[in-house]
Amino acid sequence: MAAGTLYTYPENWRAFKALIAAQYSGAQVRVLSAPPHFHFGQTNRTPEFLRKFPAGKVPAFEGDDGFCVFESNAIAYYVSNEELRGSTPEAAAQVVQWVSFADSDIVPPASTWVFPTLGIMHHNKQATENAKEEVKRILGLLDTHLKTRTFLVGERVTLADITVVCTLLWLYKQVLEPSFRQAFPNTNRWFLTCINQPQFRAILGEVKLCEKMAQFDAKKFAESQPKKDTPRKEKGSREEKQKPQAERKEEKKAAAPAPEEEMDECEQALAAEPKAKDPFAHLPKSTFVLDEFKRKYSNEDTLSVALPYFWEHFDKDGWSLWYAEYRFPEELTQTFMSCNLITGMFQRLDKLRKNAFASVILFGTNNSSSISGVWVFRGQELAFPLSPDWQVDYESYTWRKLDPGSEETQTLVREYFSWEGTFQHVGKAVNQGKIFK
């Protein structure tokens, strides 16, 4: 089973393909998408990154065994299982057919139509109208194919469904309003069936379909464009004027700034996004440096080094401890699927890593398991309400604030951080644990 790290930027629909595939196959995929671990536009241009991934593109996957692969479809294929890839030569060929169709037929018109509504690309009326007609053709083609089928290939979800759904995602979210999509009931049924599968929801969350077709906003587009400073012209000195014309031209040529590197569509999307406000900016400075504890936890012995460091430096006024327990243990069946619930939550909380740490454990066996963990948050309240992006999963858990000075808390922190102990409050053996750091 594949295991490794996926480098990407936040909310990259191309990365969703591999992450959803991993939900089905059970592949263990860690995501690095935000500083300090990964800074898109910088990290992926470093010599170290380019040695592994010469194209400098993301998503890029580095296996725990050192195997490296880029291109989203290749990564999704690698982390999949036989069922997703197509269990017969004929099914496998059809999966490749739809994956190729998504890239060649869906991406171009979808980008032409959707990107201007996001302020990423300038609007061209004729190009947009052509793209709309092309999208109609594609949805109609899918509608005919799905008239007698639940999924694109065979009777179960495959990479074909995962890839095409992810490619259509922004169309359904941004421009396919009810009056436009109603002509394609079979495509809509299939799309809704897929996005409501637990494995899709674990990565995509709740997908809200477009209610009103988004339009190009010229002001938003103008604001998204990088502003260039125009140097002020100054009168040249007498000596400057006396220089030979050819010499002055050479100096100007030498002083001319290097042309800006052309941004790809993903970088343009990031540049277009307004800088997010730090949800924790209102809190006073704390003496507890979470990153330093994380380094101790990752590189030193937990019981003899990391835990003593934690309690010695923990700032109970600037940080808080919480115990979380999954509300619906009766719904947990296969342990690998239960583990994927934890992984999916961690992935959606990626931007919270700088201000949180957690150890979450899956206890028990198939059809008899539970999930609980200990969390460390900046501030005295739960962090999830501070950002809509963090609110997908937390209501599925009960949360209890812990007293850092109590013996119970000391025991919980020791057992959950080390994955060792009696866990008397659980009544089940440790199956496996996950660390959010």
UniProtKB/Swiss-Prot annotation:
As recorded in UniProt, coiled-coil segments are: none
What Gene3D superfamilies has UniProt attached to this entry? 1.20.1050.10, Glutaredoxin, Translation elongation factor EF1B, gamma chain, conserved domain
Q: Which residues carry this modification: N-acetylalanine?
A: A2
* Matches recorded under Pfam families: EF1G (PF00647), GST_C (PF00043), GST_N (PF02798)
GO CC annotations on file: endoplasmic reticulum
Subunit structure as annotated in this protein's UniProt entry = EF-1 is composed of four subunits: alpha, beta, delta, and gamma.
Q: Give the UniProt keywords, A-Z.
A: Acetylation, Elongation factor, Isopeptide bond, Protein biosynthesis, Ubl conjugation
Identify the residues that the record assigns to the GST C-terminal domain, covering every copy.
88-216
Q: Which CDD domains does this chain map to?
A: GST_C_EF1Bgamma_like, GST_N_EF1Bgamma
Residues recorded with modification N6-malonyllysine = K434
Q: Could you identify this protein by its name?
A: Elongation factor 1-gamma
Q: Which residues carry this modification: N6-acetyllysine?
A: K147, K212, K401, K434
Per UniProt, location of the Glycyl lysine isopeptide (Lys-Gly) (interchain with G-Cter in SUMO2) cross-link in this chain: K285
The UniProt gene name for this protein comes to: Eef1g
The UniProt entry, under InterPro entries, shows: EF-GSTs, EF1B_G_C, EF1B_G_C_sf, Glutathione-S-Trfase_C-like, Glutathione-S-Trfase_C_sf, Glutathione_S-Trfase, Glutathione_S-Trfase_N, GST_C
GO term, biological process aspect, one: response to virus
Q: Which residues form the GST N-terminal domain?
A: 2-87
Source taxonomy:
Eukaryota, Metazoa, Chordata, Craniata, Vertebrata
Does the keyword section mention Protein biosynthesis? yes
Compositionally biased, Basic and acidic residues: which spans?
221-254
Chain segments carrying region Disordered: 221-268
